[in-house]
Amino acid sequence: MPFKSLKELDPSEGTVQLYSGNISQQHLGDGDTVLFPQPSADPNDPLRWSKWRKHAVFLSICLFACLNNLNGTVLTDSFLTISEQLDVSVTEASGLLSWVVLIQGLANFIWVPTAIYFGKRPVFLLACAIDFIGAIWAAASPDFGSLLAASIFGGFGGGASEALGAAIINDIYFLHERGSKMSWYIISIAWGSSLGPLVGGYLIEYKGWQWGKWLGSILLGVNLLLIFFFAPETRFQRSPNPSVGSDPSLSSDSPSEKLGSRSEHLELGSNSPSSGRPSAAYPHKSYLQSLNPWSGIAPGASFWDLMFRPIPLLAYPACAFAALAYSLALAPTIMVNALSSTILIPPPYYFSIGSVGLINIAGMIGQGIGAFIGGFCIDKWSSFCARRNNGVFVPETRLLLFILPTIIVFAGILLFGFAVQLEMHWAIIFLAYGMLSVGLTGSASITMVYVCDCYFPVAAECLEMINGIKNVVAFALGYAVVPWVDNMGYIRAFGTLSGIFGGLMALVIPLLLWGPQIRHHTSSKWRLVSWELE
């Protein structure tokens, strides 16, 4: 099986001229922001779509991510009720969450290569339809076996909502927009997980657990219609890196020549393959034509090669760190979700089933703060740093703000352990959960955008690995958390987690210090991208 280096696919190695007065490049409006990637001359290029069309696609995929997680977590606070009504143990009932999380992660390894090969639109339509049917099946289930099978079936479809949604952001938005858009997407995933228990707790308390799934089916059905009418195909065959052209300054063997804090001004060549205006040589697709689910298979691609391609990419340091960071950011929220009812329902708190879900309000506030840091702030910070660097964007500038959510989460994990074991006021527990929830959006968004910046040609495959690993970790924690806390107590268990979290998150320091050199070496020397053509 032939392998290529990243540099053969993207000579920029992630470093691009983001601000320039060079008239041979396409810019944002009349300003000096260089569009990366450069749009092609084809009017059907997703980068050329109108704002409303891009935002309609973006809203549709964000809703799918949110509603899939809402449907998957809506029964979280009713495991005790389900165990009593369907004659199973609470541990078995918790499989309605843990098994679904695992299947969603593993489904990435099927959905992503399928979408690259057959197109993202047919995959999203099929995946949302499976999720929708699974919710109806679950709501009508007469016994636990049927309910679990339906949840797993729907979870398989819902797995497409994570890595593929992030890949679509890469398809339709430019580099200077990615941070904010990725943060909105991540917060859609996180808020779905928080809204499920929050809404489901009260709904199930008064209407029964079946209505939790009926609600999910109704919302997913509406979302399926939105995807059909407003999410056309975003897959597009473009030059490996048309914004860089053949400029030797961006492919220098010495990264210090182009990445210094005051590097020389870079001028991209005038031989850019893109033109500033759409070409009449390409027929423009009508709206009705865009509704066609089928756009053909990827020219020259091998499906089995696409299935295998993501695995070696985990060796790239940025990809490995992003998978680790997302998993660690998710870990404390998984633990709290698994333990919240056992903490808040017994004395001294005496919360009802419905009221337990209120802890997710604190989580949503924390996730909102994390999204602000990981979206708006990193875009503004990256822009500021690029302008100070003579217009040159360096992906590692995003990682400096990674430190802020890391500190907040570290403190939140410690506070939660002490607050529960010492039976502090419930408001302290809520505050701690809000703090540790900051990382679920802040840390995840920053690292996923960093991966897209570094490995643009294989971003979808990298995101596939990141999301798959993250969900496997979540599955393991779902089973391990209760015995872990029982054996060690809350202070020691969450103290251990905070130590693991802080120690492994510190691995961002080598990327901050030597990231450009690491990228240059690995992209030019490591041939890890399998590239077999049929």
Give the positions of each predicted feature:
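C-terminal transmembrane bundle
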Residues: 69, 98-101, 105, 112, ...
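Pair of pore-lining "gating" transmembrane helices in MFS-fold secondary transporters
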Residues: 54-72, 152, 315-333, 434-435
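Cytoplasmic helix-loop-helix junction between adjacent transmembrane helices
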Residues: 151-189
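Short hydrophobic/alpha-helical segments at membrane-entry points of transmembrane helices
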Residues: 143-151, 163, 212-213, 322, ...
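Extracytoplasmic
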Residues: 53-90, 106, 111, 161, ...
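Intracellular terminal tails of multi-pass secondary transporters
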Residues: 1-68, 72, 90, 210-211, ...
